Amino acid sequence: MELNNIEIQKIIPHRYPFLLVDKMVEVELGKRGVGIKNVTANEPFFQGHFPGNPIMPGVLMTEALAQVAALICMGLEENKGKLGVFTGIDKCKFRRQVVPGDVLRLEIEMTALRRGIGKAEGKAYVGEELACSASLTFALINPNTDK
């Protein structure tokens, strides 16, 4: 299954400038997925990171991976309307700078999804080069009652 940007926005609540997944090219709900982020010179974070030498902040690469994980989990019928929130990031490594013009391929493999807690392994690539890898943990909460 693939998802375009409009379909993505029906599943997760993120919006510009914080929606960091342009499309999903592979989706296996509850299991795995591959998303794409086209990094442009117009990204708002490049204004201050860094003027004259724009580099995508590493924390936004991990957030993009988390958004792919959220799409995989929140697309399941039992998770519709829930909100995915980070509970942990482990073994995070940044191996390559991501700059304007790069296409970031965001790969997520779910390792656990039980009782509203998800765990996933994420990797972000530019071409065949690994840019970022991390183990992500998150909770799926009801935004109206869980705080």
Curated annotation (Swiss-Prot):
Function description: Involved in unsaturated fatty acids biosynthesis. Catalyzes the dehydration of short chain beta-hydroxyacyl-ACPs and long chain saturated and unsaturated beta-hydroxyacyl-ACPs.
Say if the entry is tagged with keyword Lyase.
Answer: yes
Q: What's the EC number here?
A: 4.2.1.59
Species of origin: Alkaliphilus metalliredigens (strain QYMF)
State the superkingdom.
Bacteria
Q: Quickly give the catalysed reaction.
A: a (3R)-hydroxyacyl-[ACP] = a (2E)-enoyl-[ACP] + H2O
Q: Looking at its record, which EC class is this enzyme?
A: lyase
Q: Which UniProt keywords apply?
A: Cytoplasm, Lipid A biosynthesis, Lipid biosynthesis, Lipid metabolism, Lyase
What gene is it encoded by?
A: fabZ
InterPro entries attached to this UniProt entry: FabA_FabZ, FabZ, HotDog_dom_sf
GO MF, any single term: (3R)-hydroxyacyl-[acyl-carrier-protein] dehydratase activity
Regarding protein family, the annotation reads:
Belongs to the thioester dehydratase family. FabZ subfamily.
Q: What Pfam families does this protein map onto?
A: FabA
The name of this protein is 3-hydroxyacyl-[acyl-carrier-protein] dehydratase FabZ
